[in-house]
Structures are given as structure tokens and as C-alpha cells.
Regions:
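Helix-to-loop junction immediately C-terminal to a conserved catalytic motif
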Residues: 55
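ABC ATPase nucleotide-binding domains
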Residues: 85-87, 91, 95-238
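Glycine/charge-rich catalytic "coupling/switch" loops of P-loop NTPases
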Residues: 262-315
Length: 315
């Protein structure tokens, strides 16, 4: 469970690539200490760009990025990745094939000139934490895909970072293994108090793991909220369609009645769930799958408040 202290933040962060493509557009996000945040969205939405901006792999065009109260990137400041004290795991675990498991895991510690005895202790601790105790002398070629990803996770946490970045870290694994690692990963981040930013294309994974979810589309943050918020109170049709395969009806709201264009029906706005009431004018009706039931036409006409024509006298 997270507390209210922001550990990382993005303030009006925009990123434009040299070819003119917009990676991010005025992104604002505060990540609380100990919080597990999932970044979701379609391909090209900006979720990996947001993570890479925090990691220090790209420099934002405008805006600022802060970690633990320190600005690490703005128009004049740029702290390189190796000085941001972040652990990172990617879709491809990228273990060095010529190094043993133990040497792979200890690599970040050698870069910081950690004493050998302390390196050995931390490597054993990290491997035990991911369920690979006794694997230090094995070669990567002897490992399964799941074991290799566990080694990558051990390497990411061995230097005891205060924040963990995951970029599709589980997506290359088979579903039964992914499910198992999801649970272990969540328990581990809670036990270690790690603030976590997790990029995933899997809606179910985001819902299962995250304290809050950030939905992006074309570089814009569409909504930030709990899994329940995005499932049951989507901010717009894009969020609704991504999370729940919602059916969308374009229409017009007039005098307390929402009338759709095609197919044509109308419904009193008092029956609709809205954040701040239903404003007059054009809009989109979002119907979630579990809100629909198929019934016989005669039963529907007798019991529904939704009418298939424009006659409102029965409403």
C-alpha cells in the first residue's frame, strides 16, 4: 500500500522526436512512494516513452522530471541513467551469455565498486528472493525463459533501488508462468517497499497488479485512476473501449434525453452514470458489456426505459 509522499513526478513533460513524431504531450503524473503504477495504452501511445523519460534514456523536449525531490531532467538539467538509482527489467531479459548467473546479477554492484564480500551476500539475497537460490554458478543457456527473467529481476533489485521500472517484463512468457510471476512480483515489491512503474499491453495484468493505472493514447494521458475507476468510470470513449470493449453510441443530449444517431434510440439522462451531470449538446454513450442483456422484443418494450423511436411520452 502506498503513502502520500510523491517519489517521482512528471510536470508538463513533452517529447518530440527529431522526425517530428510526438512521443509525449504535456504529461503530468505524480507517483507516490511505494505505489505500483501500470502504464497502458495501444501501440505507439507513449507508455514506453514515459518510462524511458523517467529512466533517462531520452531527454524531454519541455517540462521537468523529478525523482525523490531532485530534478533529473528539464530544459537545462539531465542526470544520466546510472545516477538515478533505478532498477530496470525489460521484455528481453538480455543476460550476458558468457557470464554465470551470479556474475550477471552482481554486475550493477561491480559498477559501483561494492566490496566483494558484500557483492556475494547481496547476490545470494537477490537470487533467493526470486526463487533461484543455488543458481549462482549456472550458465544462462541452462535456464528456462521464466528463470532467465527471474535473473533479470534479481539483477534489477540487487543494488537495492528505491524504484523499479518494468517494460513489458512478463509479456514474452507463457500465460501460466506469467500469472505465477505476477503474484511473486507484486508480493516482492510490497515486501521491499519498491515504487514501481510497469509498462504492459495486458489490461488484465494492469488491473491485477496496479494501485493506479495510467492510460495513454497518442502521447496524451487520457486518465489516471484505480482499476475500478478506469473500468467503471472511464473518462472518455477511448478509455472505455480499451478497457472493457465498450459499445459506443454517438448522439445528442437535449432536455434530459440522450438521443443516439445510429441506431436510433433515446434514454433519460437520469439513468446514465456521469461524473458531473450530462451537459447539453453532442456526446457519446458508453455501454459496457456487463450492462447489456439480450431479451425478447416484447419483454424489452414492456420493461425498458430506453425507446427505439423518438416518442418520449412514455418516459
Amino acid at each position: 500500500m502506498s503513502n502520500s509522499h510523491p517519489y517521482a513526478s512528471f510536470q508538463d513533460v513533452s517529447l518530440e522526436y527529431p522526425n517530428g513524431t510526438i512521443g509525449l504531450s504535456k504529461a503530468n503524473l505524480s507517483i507516490n512512494e511505494g505505489e505500483f503504477i501500470a502504464l497502458v495504452g495501444p501501440s505507439g501511445s507513449g507508455k514506453t516513452t514515459l518510462l524511458n523519460t523517467l529512466a533517462g534514456f531520452v531527454h524531454p523536449t519541455t517540462g521537468s522530471v523529478s525523482i525523490n525531490g531532485q530534478v533529473v531532467a528539464d530544459e537545462s538539467i539531465f542526470v544520466p541513467p546510472e545516477h538515478r538509482h533505478l532498477g530496470m527489467v525489460f521484455q528481453q531479459h538480455a543476460l550476458w551469455p558468457h557470464m554465470s548467473v551470479g556474475r550477471n546479477v552482481e554486475y550493477p554492484l561491480k559498477q559501483t565498486k561494492t566490496p566483494q564480500d558484500e557483492r556475494r551476500r547481496r547476490v545470494n539475497w537477490a537470487l533467493k528472493l526470486v526463487g533461484l537460490e543455488g543458481f549462482a554458478d549456472r550458465n544462462p543457456s541452462e535456464l528456462s525463459g521464466g528463470q532467465s527473467q527471474r535473473v533479470a529481476i534479481a539483477r534489477a533489485i540487487v543494488a537495492q533501488p528505491s524504484m523499479l521500472l518494468l517494460d513489458e517484463a512478463l509479456s514474452a512468457l507463457d500465460e501460466p508462468l506469467r500469472e505465477s510471476l505476477r503474484l511473486e512480483l507484486r508480493h516482492m515489491t510490497i515486501d521491499l517497499g519498491l515504487t514501481t512503474l510497469h509498462v504492459t499491453h495486458d489490461r488484465g495484468e494492469a488491473i491485477a497488479l496496479a494501485d493506479r493505472i495510467v492510460m495513454l493514447d497518442h502521447g496524451h494521458i487520457r486518465q489516471i485512476g484505480t482499476p475500478d475507476d478506469l473500468l467503471n468510470r472511464p473518462a472518455d470513449p477511448i478509455v472505455a473501449s480499451f478497457f472493457d470493449d465498450a459499445t459506443l453510441f454517438e448522439g445528442q443530449c437535449d432536455n434530459g434525453i440522450f438521443r443516439t444517431h445510429k441506431p436510433s434510440f433515446h434514454i433519460p439522462t437520469r439513468l446514465l452514470q456521469t461524473e458531473d451531470g450530462m451537459p447539453e449538446g453532442p456526446g457519446t454513450l458508453v455501454v459496457l458489456p456487463d450492462a447489456m442483456t439480450l431479451v425478447e422484443d416484447s419483454i424489452w418494450r414492456e420493461n425498458t426505459a430506453v425507446s427505439p423511436d423518438m416518442d418520449t411520452s412514455s418516459l
